[in-house]
Amino acid sequence: MKKILCVLMAIAMLACMTACSGGAKSGVEDGVLTVGMECAYAPYNWTQMDDSNGAVAIVNDPGKFANGYDVMIAKKICEANGWKLEVIQSDWDSLVPGVQTGTFDAVIAGQSMTAERAEQVDFAGPYFYATIVCVTKEDSPYAAATSIADLAGGSCTAQIATIWYDQCLPQIEGANIQTAAETAPAMLMALETGMVDFICTDMPTAQGAIAAYPDMVI
């Protein structure tokens, strides 16, 4: 299963900006592209306390800076069009509504292209293809799983409003699906503290998890 990550925008194409339903602004009229992201979803985006390594100030969280793949992409878009970049931190499940209401011009946040989201906002196209995987503890009976069938009956969770939680976990027979985690770090903590047997996420997030938590395996 592949996860298609997209630039989610209130525009049809970056080169031809038009208004989107839901009251979004028409174009980058002031030369500033405002981009919404969670700023808590490494390696795509995260929060740090300085502007090292090209980090960009988070305009609605003074003193903090955003960095990651999504920030790099946003900077490239702005450089190509002569725009200034402003990053706005937003909760995951508020990103699509933020585009619809014009809170920001675009979302670049590792979100998957789905039919449901495509009915609400425009996509500028995929920028990354990520395999969806499960992460567990190295001493877990699920550590040797090689198929969905091997995960049957396990307790699990994923981040709220993601295809991992809404579409992937329900495919596991007899899965004891726990309440969705509000953030990616909360999802990882649920596994680390033993609240669940495994979590479902994408490969880049999983690779970051096992680097941070040596007792976790993909």
Label every PLM stretch briefly:
Residues 93-94, 108-120, 166-171, 192-218:
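A ligand-binding cleft/hinge motif common to bilobed small-molecule-binding domains
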Residues 26-110:
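Extracytoplasmic small-molecule ligand-binding "clamshell" domains
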Residues 52-55, 137-155:
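Flexible hinge/capping segments at coil-to-helix
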Residues 48-60, 74-83, 161-182, 211-214:
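Ligand-binding cleft/hinge of the Venus flytrap
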Residues 69-71, 86-98, 143, 178-193:
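Short helix-initiation/N-cap motifs at beta->coil->alpha
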Residues 56, 70, 118-133, 217-218:
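A structural signal for short loop-to-beta-strand junctions that line the ligand-binding cleft
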Residues 1-32:
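Short, low-complexity disordered leader/linker segments with a strong preference
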Residues 34-45, 123-146:
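Hydrophobic/proline-rich hinge and linker segments of small-molecule sensing/allosteric domains
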